[in-house]
Amino acid sequence: PDDEVASRNLLSEWIEILERDRNHPSIITWAPLTVPLSNVTSGTFARLVFDLQKLTKAIDPSRPFNDLTGSGFHFLTDIWSISTYEPDATRFALSLKPDKNQAAYANQPFIIGEFGGIVWETSRTKEDTWGHGGTFTNEDALFERIEKLINAIQSSGIISGFCYTQFSDIEQEKNGIYTYDRQPKFDMERIRSIFKKIPSKPIKK
């Protein structure tokens, strides 16, 4: 959206979306933009983000606004979110903080919108297997990877919540803990014992 006309069109469409969906009970946060591919520091893009926030709060002040979900680059947001598929637990832990070169962090809830993406490969899925965070054929090694990532989140001291990628396989991605038709892939009690760990408390203001 470095294009002025495209930005104005998006704002008009966004108003229609807000008015159509603001009473829908499943919507918990407004997130109009995701990881940007354009120049986020341009004046046109920055103005678009601020206009989206102003419109959203005017039409529905009851919900949080997340300006650039998952990007870690924020202008004006109620929720600070990042997405990372870093597989190494040590490097993953280091990424769980606001980047000092980005917008000033103002103690918003810090959310990991996406992480994990680990593929469980079987002979049946080998020809059609893809994911974000590496491929495993050894179940114990896969559980170890997941648990190390969860431990890093738990000990971060800043994370308010997280979303693992992902609940179930989809057409092109085989990194779910359930299959496409919602059948468990693993010992779900073992999965539960990892994911039930309580995230760390957010930083106090």
Stretch-by-stretch model annotation:
Residues F186:
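Histidine-centered active-site microenvironments of extracellular/periplasmic hydrolases
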Residues S193-K205:
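Surface beta-strand/loop "capping" patches
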Residues P1-R182, R190, F195:
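Substrate-binding/catalytic cleft of secreted carbohydrate-active enzymes
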